[in-house]
Amino acid sequence: MLTLPFEDPVIMDTQFGANFPRDCVGDLKGNKQEPFEKEETLSHVMDDDDSEKDEDEREDGQDENGLPRRRGPRKKKMTKARVDRVKVRRMEANARERNRMHGLNNALDSLRKVVPCYSKTQKLSKIETLRLAKNYIWALSEILSTGKRPDLLTFVQTLCKGLSQPTTNLVAGCLQLNARNFIPDQISGEASFSGRSPYESVYSTYHSPSVVTPSGPSVDAVKPFRSFNYCSSYESFYESVSPECGSPQFEGPLSPPINFNGIFSLKHEEPVEYGKSCHYGTRYCAVPPRASIGQSARGSSDLHFPYDIHLRGQFYPVQDELNTFHN
């Protein structure tokens, strides 16, 4: 077995000294201790930075007056380039908003030309235009689904659902319909309307042969007018019916009208000849308009007028009755 004695210094020196000289051992030991020294220096630097930050925070914690300051991110300094960038971004945002509003207004103007509401003096608001367009689209879809043409009153009621009164008047005027013929507040959710006037159940209709009902889009909604016989008191004095009166002809002669001679007296008085004492003139005298002068002069005492003839110089017998009643 080949072994080398440890006491031989020559062999050890030649074998070890060829690769690693003895002078390098001290250098290696010195190099191994350098990283620890660097860590110590870094720790000292970080401690110094922390102390500076603490001092800054202490300084920022109070202002000149000793009041606490706001903590948070510090505001960046406004340089000229940054001011220009902010101004450009703001101008671009304003231009986008302006273009958006112009496009919206143009679309609403186009929509106002389509909906059935036109006025030269009044312009619909944005919300009223959108509501009317929604009702119009819904009404057209109902027409397409049912395949029947609706009544004009029903169509207008559908269009005016949820609209204000001025817009309702405009729509009714555009469709040539009176806005009083329907009540938009009583419209239900579905378009099931009878097409009749809501006032028809309150007022009973009066059918007269002398009155002609006007023809219109909704005949049922128009309330016929009633003829009043204003000339019925004069018809008993003539053989034929007066053409100015709208009342029907009478089947037989009527009794003379009742005379109102006083407040509390309601009785029929016999005709009195007033022609003898008429030098003061007459008042409240109702002369038949169609009678000629000769007929009125010849039959003045025989005819009985619907109103009393009061003479200025005449004493009434009813006055005595009134005085007796009050005394």
Curated annotation (Swiss-Prot):
Positions with biased composition (Basic and acidic residues): 24-46
Pfam families, per database record: HLH, Neuro_bHLH
Gene Ontology CC annotations of this record: nucleus
UniProt GO MF annotations: DNA-binding transcription factor activity, RNA polymerase II-specific; E-box binding; protein dimerization activity
Annotated keywords: Activator, Developmental protein, Differentiation, DNA-binding, Neurogenesis, Nucleus, Transcription, Transcription regulation
UniProt cross-references to PROSITE patterns, sorted A to Z: BHLH (PS50888)
Disulfide pattern: none
SMART domains on file: HLH (SM00353)
Motif (Nuclear localization signal): 74-80
Domain of life: Eukaryota
GO BP: axon development; positive regulation of neurogenesis; positive regulation of transcription by RNA polymerase II; sensory organ development
Basic residues bias: start-end ranges: 68-80
Function: Differentiation factor required for neurogenesis. Acts as an upstream activator of isl1.
PANTHER family the record matches: BASIC HELIX-LOOP-HELIX PROTEIN NEUROGENIN-RELATED (PTHR19290), NEUROGENIC DIFFERENTIATION FACTOR 6 (PTHR19290:SF9)
Oligomeric form and interacting partners: Efficient DNA binding requires dimerization with another bHLH protein.
Protein name per UniProt: Neurogenic differentiation factor 6-A
Protein source organism: Danio rerio (Zebrafish)
